[in-house]
Amino acid sequence: MKIDPRAFSKDGFLKDQDYLSNFPYGRYPTSFNGCGWVAIYNAEHAAGHGIAVEAVYEAMRRILPYEGTHGTPFPTMVRYFKEKHIPIARIYGSGEELVRIVRESAAPRGILRYIEGREPHYIAFVRVSDETPARYRFFNAADGKEDFVETMEYFRREHLGGRRVVRLLLPGEEREDARARGKNHIVDAKWSEHLPRRCVQYPVLRRKNSFEPLSGIGRGA
């Protein structure tokens, strides 16, 4: 399938899922429910893995449950990285907690799952500066915020408000020699020491008498 060039940033990130309506994702077009696989592609692209958009799309479409009617469930996002033998830290908590974790670990990139307006949504972010506070580049966040640079605290304030649970994925990298041995290692020296296990799970904060969808649908308002 041909990709509308308007979906891309100049350096090859997918910045706007609205231009991917010709990519069916379960029952719906990617423009409606494909934020999950778009975020994974951006994280892969940021890591320099050289993977094609179509390869990520096909891999995610193959493991997508419920015909995409629930968007991309969080466990499906994790499954993608596990099947690719990429170590992944999986973290749950409030917006404040996750901002702190990203800051303290100096994570170079990651994926956030949160509520944009009333819709569950995934975005990828990439660290672009080491100044204090660090600045990050965010992709496919909302209309008018398809590709922008800001602090994580700004993003929390504007997009992670309330007491809803936020989910964070911090994918690592593989060494070529480790892959040959069938083993995987997180090799980003700046932050690997903060992620001692392949899966880090923090206590889940839940609101009483409330329901939060577990998927990612749409790109927000």
Q: Language-model features: where?
A:
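Ala/Thr-enriched low-complexity intrinsically disordered regions
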Residues: 178-180, 189, 221
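Intrinsic-disorder/low-complexity regions
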Residues: 3, 10, 15-17, 21, ...
